Design a protein with these regions (language model features):
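Beta-rich nucleic-acid/ligand-interaction surfaces
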Residues: 40-44, 207-209, 270, 462, ...
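A carboxyl-terminal module marker
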Residues: 2, 445-449, 469, 473, ...
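Glycine/proline-enriched, intrinsically flexible loops and inter-domain linkers
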Residues: 4-5, 23, 28, 40, ...
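Phosphate-backbone binding interfaces of nucleic-acid-interacting proteins
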Residues: 1-211, 346, 363, 369, ...
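Conserved mixed alpha/beta core segments that line enzyme active sites in large multi-domain catalysts
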Residues: 49-79, 249-250, 254, 261, ...
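Mobile "lid/hinge" segments at catalytic clefts and subdomain interfaces of large enzymes
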Residues: 117-130, 139-142, 155-164, 305, ...
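Extended, well-folded interaction surfaces typified by the phenylalanyl-tRNA synthetase beta subunit core
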Residues: 420-424, 428-586, 738, 791-796, ...
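Terminal amphipathic helices with adjacent charged low-complexity linkers/tails
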Residues: 187, 191-223, 398-427, 434, ...
């Protein structure tokens, strides 16, 4: 939020420099991100002087240029070539001398000695646009030579001033500080603590018309006080909507706002001055009445010319015919604002429900200065002053305008201050230092916190309603501490430390980092997707059934209305997005939680909700080119076997043997054909992988194969917890390899063959690998050929041929007897 140093000084007396103000605000919790000098005219007219044109002759080589001599208060006049049609001898002009830097928008250029059509020029005569003092570019600026002196700095003549803008980072709980007066209030408390007692002050305003007298515009509030705690306004007639005076325009421009007209500018000024949003309705467009009501299912064009789709949950201010004029707390409608033809307005100062404003603003994708404040919760007691401040300024700046009738004020349940009990002894304990009681009381008073009663260890406090962040004793203690000064609280002479062994959660986190580094090193990129998903993704799926989805009560949109059951869809979105950007390789991984409704789950810990299951999950996506074409390689696409290899590498890195898991093909409608899974022998799922079904890929316009593996990290991590590190000598005797080529039923898997071989030879069989698979011609129907390698090793001696042959015969017989296999 931008804070003007000059405007801030109008609310609190101080002798601090802008940098000192920034340091002071940061020390009390209003962090200042930067301080920038802002000049009323960009560039400050540096290098520009007033000159008198002594002579003006037509350029000998051009019929539209003139060669002038200009007195700029130097020893000799300057020769300057000028193309402006209104240049003439005897005129006073603005001269940019050599070396002057002129700024035009975001660009700047330096005036240099030049030669124009053969004639030397030692400067430039300037127009309003070229130096930023106006919009006339038809000719150069002409001044009265009788009242100006050559050599006078242009900055002095035009009254250039400068201000400083402080960029204050407001935390979400400090809505009271989202205005100049709010910041001034905190700064006054700081100064008082530094021994410079002062208070923030507001300018005088017109007295508010009585709320009981009739307002000439009927207003109906058709919602309860929850949605609209207060709605206040009055009618101003006889307006002539003109351009704002220079001081108001400059102030808004300093804050980064664009001046529009005097009425709109005043409402924006008061918003930044006091923090209360306002809105002015052109009475000619209201139909003679206003209504605060819930919208219909309708569209509305907003002031920024965007079209918003309203729902029955949106609060609006409507005309006599029910047409929405303004989205409450967010933005006005394009057809309700004030223009140069406006003569009568209804000036609104209201308080709307923070949650309602936030939901509407998010759904409409609109973020305004008004919604920024309403979303954080405003004090309904402060609408009247803001209303009268704006009315006072409008009447002052628009002569002939007047307030017609009384003030409408719908305030059914007045907001009360917060009642808090402070125990000074608890304050000392929490801060870690004794705070003198009178000093604590002075700090509270400087923050406008009233001490109703003050017993020895029980102070009854009344906190202003605008301090929505101070509702508990701990909040009050924090307020005392920040004004007392964090730097004034000494460190304790004792050092306290807690040492605890590394727990299961720490070990799980370490394993996650280990695997992330492994995957990143293998060429994967990590994804970070939203846990919210679209219900439409799950339609018709049995593996992720819609009746197991966790629905959001108040979704931001229909595309983010459920919690995800699988990580798959987030990865498909990433692949689709990058595929459209001509990427070729898609190797992704993501850590995330998946959610499902599970009525059988009972609450067991503080973080476990009854009826829901939350699973930590690791997702892997492999798609596109594994190796992209080059002089050394042809394109090589990703394959399901590559994905399986990465999964096995993960298991291996955690010390988990593939043999300790049950591998099988499973039916899964996420995949083409069947999926492949690993599970514990007691049935707990660990890995599910396969080729994503083309019908799913089509939803994301993906036309390449995608292979996906989803790892249940909760179950895998439990297995890793049971792994023990074993240390063994390096083998001293050679490994022996023997191969078998087998003809068997096509439904038999390699994992089944490997497990059968290990059961047949438990001691000396070290590994089994598959090096060839063949199906097709020259084989009986329903058969396939597997070529397997068996690795044998004895750690105590070199194996003999007789011993090797006996083991291989035993393995072969076991496979033949179990699966009916035959040697090829």
């Amino acid at each position: 939020m931008n804070i003007s140093y000059d405007l801030l000084r109008s609310y609190v007396e101080m002798d601090l420099t802008p940098d000192e103000v920034a340091a002071a605000l940061t020390s009390i919790g209003l962090e200042v991100g930067g301080v920038e000098e802002v000049e009323s005219i960009p560039g400050g007219l540096k290098g520009l002087v007033i000159g008198h044109v002594l002579t003006c002759d037509v350029h000998e080589n051009s019929n539209h240029l003139h060669v002038t001599t200009v007195d700029v208060g130097a020893e000799a006049p300057l020769q300057i070539v000028c193309g402006a049609p209104n240049v003439a001898a005897g005129k006073a002009v603005v001269v940019a001398t050599i070396g002057t830097v002129l700024t035009s928008g975001d660009e700047s250029f330096t005036i240099k000695k030049s030669k124009i059509r053969g004639v030397e020029s030692f400067g430039m005569l300037c127009s309003e646009v070229e130096i930023g003092v106006g919009h006339d570019n038809s000719g150069i600026i002409l001044l009265d030579a009788a009242t100006t002196k050559p050599g006078t700095p242009a900055a002095e003549h035009f009254g250039v001033s400068s201000d400083y803008v402080l960029e204050v980072d407001i935390t979400p709980n400090r809505v009271d500080a989202t205005s100049h007066y709010g910041v001034a209030r905190d700064l006054a408390a700081y100064l008082t603590q530094q021994g410079k007692a002062t208070k923030a002050k507001l300018p005088e305003v017109l007295p508010a018309p009585a709320a009981g007298t009739a307002c000439p515009v009927p207003v109906t509030v058709a919602v309860d006080e929850t949605l609209c705690p207060r709605f206040e306004g009055l009618v101003i007639r006889g307006l002539k909507v003109i351009e704002s005076p220079d001081w108001l325009r400059r102030q808004l421009e300093t804050l980064g706002l664009r001046p529009i007209n005097v009425v709109v500018d005043v409402t924006n000024y008061v918003l930044h001055e006091f923090g209360q949003p306002l809105h002015a309705y052109d009475l000619a467009k209201t139909g003679g009445a206003l209504s605060v009501q819930l919208a219909r299912e309708e569209k509305m064009v907003l002031l920024d010319k965007s079209e918003g789709q309203l729902t029955e949950r949106d609060l609006v201010i409507a005309s006599a015919t029910g047409e929405p004029l303004c989205v409450a707390g967010v933005m006005g409608g394009l057809d309700s604002g004030t223009t140069e033809t406006t003569t009568d307005i209804f000036l609104e100062s209201a308080n709307f429900n923070a949650t309602s404003v936030r939901k509407t603003a998010r759904r409409l994708a609109v973020n305004t200065d008004s919604s920024f404040r309403f979303e954080r919760g405003l004090d309904p007691n402060r609408t009247t002053w803001a209303l009268m401040r704006a009315a006072s300024l409008i009447l002052e700046l628009c002569p002939g305008s007047y307030i017609d009738g009384g003030r409408f004020d719908h305030y059914p349940v007045p907001a009360q201050p917060y009642e808090v009990t402070l125990r000074p002894s608890h304050m000392d304990a929490l801060i870690g230092k004794f705070i003198p009681r009178d000093e604590a009381a002075r700090i509270l008073e400087s923050l406008e916190i009233e001490i109703v009663s003050r017993e020895e260890d029980a102070w009854q406090l009344r906190v202003p309603r605008y301090r929505i962040d101070v509702t508990r004793e701990a909040d009050v203690i924090e307020e005392v501490m920040r004004i007392y000064g964090y730097n004034n609280i000494e460190l304790s002479g004792y050092v306290h430390a807690n040492l605890s062994p590394k727990g299961a959660n720490d070990r799980s986190y370490s394993r996650r980092i280990l695997l992330s580094e492994q995957l990143t090193g293998a060429g994967f990129n990590e994804l970070l997707n939203n846990s919210l998903s679209s219900e439409a993704y799950y339609e018709g799926l049995t593996s992720c059934p819609a009746d197991k989805l966790v629905q959001l009560v108040n979704p931001l949109s229909s595309e983010l209305n459920v919690m995800r059951q699988t990580l798959l869809f987030g990865g498909l979105s990433a692949i689709s997005r990058n595929l459209r950007r001509q990427q070729k390789s898609f190797y992704y991984y993501e850590w995330g939680n998946c959610y499902a409704a599970a009525p059988e789950v009972e609450r067991s810990t503080a973080t476990t909700l009854a009826g829901y299951r939350e699973t930590q999950t690791l997702g892997l996506w492999v798609a596109g080119a594994r190796i992209q074409s080059s002089w050394a390689h042809a394109d090589e696409p990703a394959s399901p076997f590559e994905l399986k290899a990465y999964v096995l590498h993960i298991l291996e890195r955690l010390g988990i043997s593939e043999r300790s898991l049950r591998a099988e093909f499973v039916e899964c409608d996420l995949f083409t054909g069947r999926g492949y899974s690993y599970a514990t022998y007691d049935g707990k799922p660990v890995v599910l992988m396969g080729q994503v079904k083309s019908a799913l890929l089509a939803k994301w316009d993906i036309d390449i194969p995608v292979y996906y593996a989803e790892i249940n990290w909760d179950n895998l991590n439990r297995l890793a917890e049971r792994v023990k590190i074993e240390i063994a000598d390096l083998p001293k005797f050679p490994v022996v390899r023997r191969d078998l080529s087998l003809l068997l039923d096509e439904k038999i898997t390699f994992a089944e063959l490997a497990e059968t071989a290990r059961r047949a030879e438990k001691k000396l069989l070290r590994d089994v690998t598959l090096f060839d698979v063949y199906e097709g011609k020259n084989l009986p129907a329903g058969k396939k050929s597997y070529a397997l390698s068996f690795y044998l090793q004895d750690t105590e001696r070199t194996m003999s041929d007789k011993q090797i042959d006996a083991i291989m015969a035993k393995i072969r017989k076991s496979i033949e007897d179990t699966y009916g296999a035959t040697l090829r």
